A protein has these predicted regions:
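Single-stranded RNA-binding regions, centering on S1/OB-family and related RNA-binding modules
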Residues: 1-279
Length: 279
Protein backbone atom coordinates (compact mmCIF):
# COMPACT_ATOMS: atom_id res chain seq x y z
CA UNK A 1 0.00 0.00 0.00
CA UNK A 2 1.28 3.49 -0.87
CA UNK A 3 0.15 6.73 0.74
CA UNK A 4 -0.29 10.17 -0.85
CA UNK A 5 1.40 13.02 0.96
CA UNK A 6 -0.56 16.26 0.88
CA UNK A 7 -3.87 14.51 0.25
CA UNK A 8 -6.54 12.58 2.15
CA UNK A 9 -5.96 8.86 2.67
CA UNK A 10 -8.11 6.06 4.12
CA UNK A 11 -5.83 4.42 6.70
CA UNK A 12 -6.42 1.68 9.27
CA UNK A 13 -5.92 2.23 13.00
CA UNK A 14 -3.34 -0.33 14.17
CA UNK A 15 -2.22 0.89 17.62
CA UNK A 16 -3.53 3.02 20.49
CA UNK A 17 -1.14 5.10 22.61
CA UNK A 18 -1.51 7.79 25.28
CA UNK A 19 -0.89 10.60 22.77
CA UNK A 20 -3.07 9.32 19.93
CA UNK A 21 -3.32 6.37 17.57
CA UNK A 22 -1.03 4.97 14.94
CA UNK A 23 -2.26 4.31 11.41
CA UNK A 24 -0.98 1.79 8.90
CA UNK A 25 1.08 3.76 6.38
CA UNK A 26 2.19 0.77 4.36
CA UNK A 27 5.75 1.24 3.14
CA UNK A 28 6.02 4.45 5.19
CA UNK A 29 5.42 2.54 8.43
CA UNK A 30 3.08 3.65 11.21
CA UNK A 31 1.80 7.23 11.10
CA UNK A 32 0.69 9.13 14.21
CA UNK A 33 -2.74 10.72 14.48
CA UNK A 34 -2.48 12.95 17.61
CA UNK A 35 -5.13 12.67 20.32
CA UNK A 36 -6.81 15.99 19.46
CA UNK A 37 -7.83 14.56 16.07
CA UNK A 38 -8.88 11.05 17.15
CA UNK A 39 -12.67 10.43 17.00
CA UNK A 40 -14.22 9.52 20.38
CA UNK A 41 -15.39 6.07 19.31
CA UNK A 42 -12.18 5.21 17.43
CA UNK A 43 -10.82 1.67 17.88
CA UNK A 44 -8.21 -0.62 16.35
CA UNK A 45 -9.33 -1.85 12.95
CA UNK A 46 -11.25 1.32 12.08
CA UNK A 47 -10.42 3.14 8.86
CA UNK A 48 -10.06 6.91 9.12
CA UNK A 49 -9.99 9.54 6.38
CA UNK A 50 -6.91 11.61 7.24
CA UNK A 51 -4.76 14.26 5.60
CA UNK A 52 -1.02 13.51 5.59
CA UNK A 53 1.75 16.10 5.84
CA UNK A 54 5.13 16.65 7.52
CA UNK A 55 5.21 18.20 11.00
CA UNK A 56 7.71 20.75 12.38
CA UNK A 57 10.33 17.99 12.70
CA UNK A 58 9.71 16.76 9.12
CA UNK A 59 7.95 13.63 10.41
CA UNK A 60 4.97 12.19 8.56
CA UNK A 61 1.84 12.94 10.57
CA UNK A 62 -1.93 12.68 10.11
CA UNK A 63 -4.81 15.03 10.85
CA UNK A 64 -8.57 14.99 10.39
CA UNK A 65 -8.55 18.74 9.71
CA UNK A 66 -9.27 19.84 6.15
CA UNK A 67 -6.55 22.16 4.82
CA UNK A 68 -7.36 25.13 2.59
CA UNK A 69 -5.44 23.50 -0.26
CA UNK A 70 -4.19 20.01 -1.11
CA UNK A 71 -1.33 18.90 -3.33
CA UNK A 72 -2.28 19.46 -6.96
CA UNK A 73 -4.76 22.22 -6.16
CA UNK A 74 -4.84 26.01 -6.46
CA UNK A 75 -5.97 28.38 -3.71
CA UNK A 76 -5.68 31.98 -2.52
CA UNK A 77 -3.88 32.04 0.84
CA UNK A 78 -2.63 34.68 3.27
CA UNK A 79 1.02 35.20 4.14
CA UNK A 80 1.48 34.99 7.93
CA UNK A 81 5.25 35.37 8.19
CA UNK A 82 8.44 35.57 6.14
CA UNK A 83 12.11 34.79 6.76
CA UNK A 84 15.37 34.66 4.83
CA UNK A 85 14.22 31.56 2.93
CA UNK A 86 10.74 32.54 1.79
CA UNK A 87 7.16 33.14 2.88
CA UNK A 88 4.76 31.04 4.93
CA UNK A 89 1.04 30.77 4.24
CA UNK A 90 -1.88 29.91 6.50
CA UNK A 91 -3.47 26.79 5.04
CA UNK A 92 -5.46 25.75 8.11
CA UNK A 93 -2.89 23.41 9.69
CA UNK A 94 -0.47 23.87 12.60
CA UNK A 95 2.56 23.96 10.28
CA UNK A 96 2.36 26.80 7.73
CA UNK A 97 2.81 26.22 4.00
CA UNK A 98 6.21 27.30 2.64
CA UNK A 99 6.75 29.35 -0.54
CA UNK A 100 10.46 29.60 -1.46
CA UNK A 101 11.64 32.93 -2.87
CA UNK A 102 12.30 31.13 -6.16
CA UNK A 103 8.57 30.33 -6.41
CA UNK A 104 7.39 33.91 -5.82
CA UNK A 105 6.55 36.19 -8.76
CA UNK A 106 7.14 39.19 -6.50
CA UNK A 107 8.32 39.37 -2.91
CA UNK A 108 5.38 38.27 -0.77
CA UNK A 109 4.21 40.51 2.06
CA UNK A 110 2.70 39.55 5.42
CA UNK A 111 -1.06 40.05 5.51
CA UNK A 112 -1.55 39.87 1.75
CA UNK A 113 -3.18 36.99 -0.11
CA UNK A 114 -1.78 35.28 -3.20
CA UNK A 115 -3.05 32.63 -5.59
CA UNK A 116 -0.74 29.62 -5.35
CA UNK A 117 -0.41 25.99 -6.42
CA UNK A 118 0.52 23.31 -3.86
CA UNK A 119 2.86 20.51 -4.90
CA UNK A 120 5.56 18.16 -3.64
CA UNK A 121 9.12 19.41 -3.94
CA UNK A 122 11.06 16.87 -6.04
CA UNK A 123 14.20 17.07 -3.90
CA UNK A 124 12.98 17.48 -0.31
CA UNK A 125 9.63 15.63 -0.64
CA UNK A 126 8.06 18.52 1.29
CA UNK A 127 4.71 20.09 0.50
CA UNK A 128 5.44 23.56 -0.87
CA UNK A 129 3.57 26.26 -2.76
CA UNK A 130 4.32 28.28 -5.88
CA UNK A 131 2.89 31.61 -6.99
CA UNK A 132 4.05 30.85 -10.55
CA UNK A 133 0.75 29.15 -11.27
CA UNK A 134 1.03 29.25 -15.08
CA UNK A 135 3.45 26.33 -15.11
CA UNK A 136 0.93 24.11 -13.31
CA UNK A 137 -2.03 24.78 -15.60
CA UNK A 138 -2.83 22.10 -18.17
CA UNK A 139 -1.66 22.70 -21.73
CA UNK A 140 -4.18 20.17 -23.08
CA UNK A 141 -7.19 21.41 -25.02
CA UNK A 142 -10.21 21.42 -22.66
CA UNK A 143 -13.13 19.15 -23.56
CA UNK A 144 -15.77 21.74 -22.70
CA UNK A 145 -18.87 22.62 -24.68
CA UNK A 146 -20.54 26.02 -24.80
CA UNK A 147 -22.81 26.44 -21.79
CA UNK A 148 -20.97 23.97 -19.52
CA UNK A 149 -21.00 25.03 -15.87
CA UNK A 150 -17.55 25.17 -14.27
CA UNK A 151 -15.95 26.17 -10.96
CA UNK A 152 -13.49 29.03 -11.18
CA UNK A 153 -10.92 30.79 -9.01
CA UNK A 154 -10.25 34.42 -9.96
CA UNK A 155 -6.52 34.53 -10.51
CA UNK A 156 -5.30 37.73 -12.15
CA UNK A 157 -6.53 41.11 -13.45
CA UNK A 158 -5.55 41.91 -17.05
CA UNK A 159 -6.33 44.63 -19.59
CA UNK A 160 -9.04 42.39 -21.08
CA UNK A 161 -10.68 41.36 -17.82
CA UNK A 162 -9.90 38.64 -15.27
CA UNK A 163 -7.98 35.42 -15.73
CA UNK A 164 -9.52 32.49 -13.88
CA UNK A 165 -8.45 28.95 -13.06
CA UNK A 166 -11.12 26.53 -14.27
CA UNK A 167 -11.90 23.31 -12.38
CA UNK A 168 -8.45 23.40 -10.78
CA UNK A 169 -6.84 22.68 -14.15
CA UNK A 170 -7.31 25.13 -17.02
CA UNK A 171 -6.95 28.86 -17.63
CA UNK A 172 -9.92 30.95 -18.74
CA UNK A 173 -10.86 34.59 -19.23
CA UNK A 174 -13.80 36.72 -18.10
CA UNK A 175 -14.05 39.80 -20.32
CA UNK A 176 -14.29 43.21 -18.63
CA UNK A 177 -17.29 44.35 -20.67
CA UNK A 178 -19.29 41.30 -19.53
CA UNK A 179 -18.63 41.73 -15.80
CA UNK A 180 -21.32 43.59 -13.85
CA UNK A 181 -20.17 42.98 -10.28
CA UNK A 182 -16.99 43.58 -8.31
CA UNK A 183 -14.46 40.78 -8.72
CA UNK A 184 -11.27 40.31 -6.74
CA UNK A 185 -8.34 37.94 -6.94
CA UNK A 186 -9.05 34.82 -4.90
CA UNK A 187 -12.83 34.80 -5.33
CA UNK A 188 -14.35 31.39 -6.10
CA UNK A 189 -17.63 31.02 -7.99
CA UNK A 190 -19.60 29.24 -10.68
CA UNK A 191 -19.20 30.31 -14.30
CA UNK A 192 -20.16 29.10 -17.77
CA UNK A 193 -18.09 28.31 -20.84
CA UNK A 194 -18.81 30.69 -23.72
CA UNK A 195 -16.45 28.95 -26.09
CA UNK A 196 -13.18 27.05 -26.37
CA UNK A 197 -11.19 28.97 -28.96
CA UNK A 198 -9.07 27.39 -31.70
CA UNK A 199 -5.94 28.07 -29.63
CA UNK A 200 -7.45 26.06 -26.76
CA UNK A 201 -8.10 29.07 -24.53
CA UNK A 202 -11.45 29.26 -22.77
CA UNK A 203 -13.76 32.28 -22.79
CA UNK A 204 -16.01 32.42 -19.72
CA UNK A 205 -19.17 34.21 -18.68
CA UNK A 206 -20.94 34.58 -15.34
CA UNK A 207 -24.34 34.36 -17.05
CA UNK A 208 -25.74 31.16 -18.47
CA UNK A 209 -25.40 31.59 -22.25
CA UNK A 210 -27.98 30.91 -24.93
CA UNK A 211 -31.74 30.60 -25.00
CA UNK A 212 -31.97 28.50 -21.84
CA UNK A 213 -30.69 31.46 -19.84
CA UNK A 214 -33.15 33.81 -21.51
CA UNK A 215 -36.07 31.46 -20.88
CA UNK A 216 -35.01 31.04 -17.26
CA UNK A 217 -34.67 34.79 -16.79
CA UNK A 218 -38.06 35.52 -18.35
CA UNK A 219 -39.63 33.40 -15.61
CA UNK A 220 -37.46 35.04 -12.95
CA UNK A 221 -38.39 38.52 -14.15
CA UNK A 222 -42.10 37.75 -14.29
CA UNK A 223 -42.06 36.29 -10.76
CA UNK A 224 -40.09 39.27 -9.47
CA UNK A 225 -42.62 41.74 -10.89
CA UNK A 226 -45.49 39.75 -9.37
CA UNK A 227 -43.79 39.67 -5.98
CA UNK A 228 -43.22 43.45 -6.06
CA UNK A 229 -46.82 44.60 -6.41
CA UNK A 230 -46.81 44.19 -10.18
CA UNK A 231 -44.20 46.88 -10.89
CA UNK A 232 -40.43 47.38 -11.10
CA UNK A 233 -38.57 50.65 -11.67
CA UNK A 234 -36.21 49.20 -14.27
CA UNK A 235 -36.51 49.08 -18.04
CA UNK A 236 -34.29 48.56 -21.07
CA UNK A 237 -32.83 52.06 -20.62
CA UNK A 238 -31.66 51.38 -17.05
CA UNK A 239 -27.89 51.22 -16.35
CA UNK A 240 -26.35 47.77 -16.69
CA UNK A 241 -25.02 48.04 -13.13
CA UNK A 242 -28.53 48.54 -11.70
CA UNK A 243 -29.85 45.57 -13.68
CA UNK A 244 -27.04 43.31 -12.50
CA UNK A 245 -27.41 44.46 -8.88
CA UNK A 246 -31.09 43.45 -8.97
CA UNK A 247 -31.07 40.31 -11.10
CA UNK A 248 -27.45 39.22 -11.53
CA UNK A 249 -27.68 39.20 -15.34
CA UNK A 250 -26.30 41.33 -18.15
CA UNK A 251 -28.32 44.12 -19.75
CA UNK A 252 -28.47 42.04 -22.94
CA UNK A 253 -30.11 39.14 -21.11
CA UNK A 254 -32.47 41.55 -19.31
CA UNK A 255 -33.60 43.15 -22.58
CA UNK A 256 -34.22 39.76 -24.19
CA UNK A 257 -36.21 38.66 -21.17
CA UNK A 258 -38.28 41.85 -21.29
CA UNK A 259 -38.84 41.37 -25.01
CA UNK A 260 -39.97 37.80 -24.48
CA UNK A 261 -42.55 38.79 -21.85
CA UNK A 262 -43.71 41.78 -23.91
CA UNK A 263 -44.31 39.63 -26.99
CA UNK A 264 -46.41 37.31 -24.83
CA UNK A 265 -48.45 40.33 -23.63
CA UNK A 266 -47.51 39.62 -20.01
CA UNK A 267 -46.02 43.03 -19.24
CA UNK A 268 -46.48 46.70 -20.14
CA UNK A 269 -43.50 49.00 -20.70
CA UNK A 270 -43.38 52.51 -19.21
CA UNK A 271 -40.87 55.36 -19.16
CA UNK A 272 -40.16 54.73 -15.48
CA UNK A 273 -40.37 50.94 -15.37
CA UNK A 274 -42.39 47.83 -16.15
CA UNK A 275 -45.77 46.62 -14.90
CA UNK A 276 -47.80 43.47 -15.33
CA UNK A 277 -50.11 43.71 -18.32
CA UNK A 278 -53.20 43.44 -16.13
CA UNK A 279 -52.02 46.02 -13.57
Amino acid sequence: MSIELGKFNQLEVVKEVDFGVYLDGGEEGEILLPTRYVPEDCKIGDFLNVFLYLDMDERLIATTLTPLVQVGQFACLEVVWVNQFGAFLNWGLMKDLFVPFSEQKMKMQVGRKYVIHAHLDDESYRIVASAKVERYLSKDRPEYASGDEVNILIWQKTDLGFKAIIDNKYSGLLYENEIFSTLQTGMEMKAFVKQVREDGKVDLTLQKPGFEKIDDFSKTLLNYIRENDGRIRLNDKSPAEDIYATFGVSKKTFKKGVGDLYKKHLITLHEDGITLADS
